[in-house]
């Protein structure tokens, strides 16, 4: 079972991100209402619809779809929340040293592609976490996605005390975290919901407008 990265060249036209939402029905009450409770940590799902693919994009899509081998393999796909998440300029406002804590000879540091040093600890099942964003400022608000490891979450409520955010999240924490880096460019490990999903039909034998769906996978640890 393999995990590969979604190619950066294939950007969908429309994206539907469905957050965890599964409920379980309980017994019917005396007033004929059925009580429901949330299922414990159900998966995210992601549907991507593409504009007309042709040329090299058709070949890239074919290669990705074939690499999935039905539901046998998984893909690491970004959530494509580019208009609402923190900008790359804001994220790259952070800098880091070499692994031994030293800088370059002229004092320069590395720029980061995501947050650096924003760490989260929590136990499985927790709904609320805290994180100190330091010099990054207040980059997270309710409605934004974030990542802990390979797991995406959505912030349902955020309150700030200086640079420290108290974040209510959905779903509840999928596992225990010990100083896990918080990411504002989250990805999701997903697999097809069925073997035939995402098939590419070529119109005029040349171009196609495929749609593909992924369900979050929990087969970790991923490598």
Region locations from a protein language model:
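Extracellular/virion structural assembly segments
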Residues: 1-223
């Amino acid at each position: 079972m393999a995990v590969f990265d979604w190619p950066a060249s294939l950007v969908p036209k429309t994206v539907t991100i469905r957050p965890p939402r599964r409920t379980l029905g309980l017994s019917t009450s005396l007033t004929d209402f059925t009580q429901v409770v949330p299922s414990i940590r159900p998966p995210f799902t992601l549907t991507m619809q593409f504009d007309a693919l042709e040329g090299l994009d058709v070949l890239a899509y074919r290669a990705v779809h074939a690499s999935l081998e039905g539901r046998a393999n998984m893909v690491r796909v970004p959530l494509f929340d580019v208009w609402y998440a923190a900008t790359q300029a804001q994220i790259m406002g952070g800098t880091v040293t070499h692994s031994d804590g030293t800088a370059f000879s002229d004092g320069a540091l590395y720029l980061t592609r995501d947050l650096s040093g924003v760490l989260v600890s929590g136990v499985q099942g927790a709904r609320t976490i805290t994180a100190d964003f330091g010099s990054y400022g207040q980059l997270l608000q309710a409605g934004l996605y974030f990542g802990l490891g390979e797991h995406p979450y959505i912030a349902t409520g955020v309150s700030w005390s200086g640079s420290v955010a108290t974040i209510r999240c959905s779903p509840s924490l999928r596992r225990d975290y010990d100083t896990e880096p918080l990411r504002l460019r989250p990805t999701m490990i997903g697999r097809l919901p069925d073997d035939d999903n995402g098939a590419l039909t070529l119109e005029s034998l040349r171009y196609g407008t495929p749609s593909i769906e992924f369900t979050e996978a929990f087969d970790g640890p991923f490598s």
